[in-house]
């Protein structure tokens, strides 16, 4: 029987590449995005159906879930990919930005997971693959506290759910990625700024330089991330956590090699 994968955030970047990857390999794909009326690439495939979805909107999540199940009959794998990041001093962040960061990166996956649990229970199994970041297991850059918070929360959510859902044959997996090439990297970042407070200017200048450099190098080939998603979905990998990319693996090696105080001092010194 043909398997079906449900993916959030497929309008561009990693989400779109994942949808195309699975469609080309014979899977049915429920591809979701906030603006399906603007999509052209995915509509060329008969085994891809597009559903309107903003993961922050519980009613839209429920509607997209019900429609996907009605159209395909059974969903085997759900990929929580939709997400973005807020950077800048916490002092500058608007209340709306704080709420947005948590709503998109944490409440969004919660909404999708809760919507699919009755379906997975009815079919006595299923898999959630949550797209996290190495920034969900360690800190690597100043001014990323809100993004770190959201990804640390996603990691904790996924690990905590493992114990609830394992007895029901519902699997949970984490992909911990860095930025990827061709993923409109900076389009997925919101910067917190303040025109009057200058105390953070030097630090922000160094952080912005890192972001600018990331556009040219240090980003991973997104296909390596898609390949890991495919391995998890097909049983080729049984890992609970999959850390993808050179930067994340290098930082994790450093984090595991030294006490936390030494690690934090090392990262801070890179921006001194």
Kindly label every feature range from the protein language model.
Residues 11-12:
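Conserved glycine-rich cofactor-binding loop
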Residues 53-63, 95:
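The beta1-alpha1 cofactor-binding region of Rossmann-like NAD(H)/NADP(H)-dependent oxidoreductases
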Residues 89-90, 97-100:
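Substrate-binding pocket helix/loop in short-chain dehydrogenase/reductase
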Residues 113, 150:
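Active-site helix of classical SDR
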Residues 133:
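Residue(s) in the substrate-gating loop at a strand-loop-helix junction
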Residues 168-213:
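C-terminal beta-strand-loop-alpha-helix "lid" module of Rossmann-like NAD(P)-dependent dehydrogenases
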